[in-house]
Swiss-Prot record:
TM helices/strands, residue ranges: 5-25, 62-82
Originating organism: Citrobacter koseri (strain ATCC BAA-895 / CDC 4225-83 / SGSC4696)
GO cellular component labels: plasma membrane
Subcellular location: Cell inner membrane
Domain of life, per lineage: Bacteria
Subunit structure: Forms an energy-coupling factor (ECF) transporter complex composed of an ATP-binding protein (A component, CbiO), a transmembrane protein (T component, CbiQ) and 2 possible substrate-capture proteins (S components, CbiM and CbiN) of unknown stoichimetry.
Protein's name in the database: Cobalt transport protein CbiN
Keyword field: Cell inner membrane, Cell membrane, Cobalamin biosynthesis, Cobalt, Cobalt transport, Ion transport, Membrane, Transmembrane, Transmembrane helix, Transport
């Protein structure tokens, strides 16, 4: 029980603490940051690849990103649960 409370407090701290560390911070994407750095380093750079699908709006892009993350988490936790179930089954035998 004590271990659970400590872990819960750590998770809450990890979620809340960033809001107090940098009040004027801006939540920006890594793609935009990389693009601006490329323009600084090599202003005449031409991208050599175009995306296969470009979402119509930022909301759709966020939705697809969230779905991708959810699917990845589902696969990871399925594998973890499956291996835990196999381990329990093998322990009983």
């Amino acid at each position: 029980m004590k271990k659970t409370l400590i872990l819960l407090a750590m998770v809450i701290a990890l979620v809340i603490l960033p809001f107090f560390i940098d009040h004027g911070g801006e939540f920006g994407g890594s793609d935009g940051e990389a693009e601006s750095q490329i323009q600084v380093v090599a202003p005449h750079y031409e991208p050599w690849f175009q995306p296969l699908y470009e979402p119509a709006s930022g909301e759709i892009e966020s939705l697809l990103f969230t779905l991708q993350g959810s699917l990845g988490a589902a696969v990871i936790f399925y594998i973890l649960g499956y291996s835990k179930g196999r381990q329990r089954r093998d322990d009983r035998a």
